[in-house]
């Protein structure tokens, strides 16, 4: 954290030395490599930033933090085609139509039950600084008992996850698929936005696959 603060204060040379020391202490710590690459990008050393990303990814293929930052660096270098090849949004971004569980009359009733459960959840917190939600509430884990209607949603999401992984399984050389886990665990949380509510730009570094389901919109 001190290293990041030094960078923000403009102490770039000291910050670079400190980053190198931090990486030397724990070469596997992805966040240190991302922050170092970010510093290099800020001071106009984009090629060095790319080198940091590529060297780490040789040892940790498919790491989401360095892969994501590598696309940013590539765009800064003007290599948009290579960046888009990694992102491959048309290939990896999929949509699924949520099916109505058997014990609900229709999908609207199911969504209403999910909304009601979320609004009454004891873990709802106002825009926690540890998360990306702003002007809204953010819940904790919704798959802990009592799950309520989220138990039915859990089964649906797991089936979609399995289908997604099977459909893309042949693309074994892409960084995203290199990081695909053998076993998958699902985590679900909810967000309730007010007027001007939004999410800060972010990724989920501990996750392989992320998705969103809008229960209710204005």
Predicted feature descriptions by range:
Residues 25, 59-60:
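Structural marker of alpha-solenoid helical repeat scaffolds
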Residues 83-177:
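Non-heme Fe(II)/2-oxoglutarate
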Residues 148-158, 162-218:
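Catalytic core of non-heme Fe(II) oxygenases with the double-stranded beta-helix
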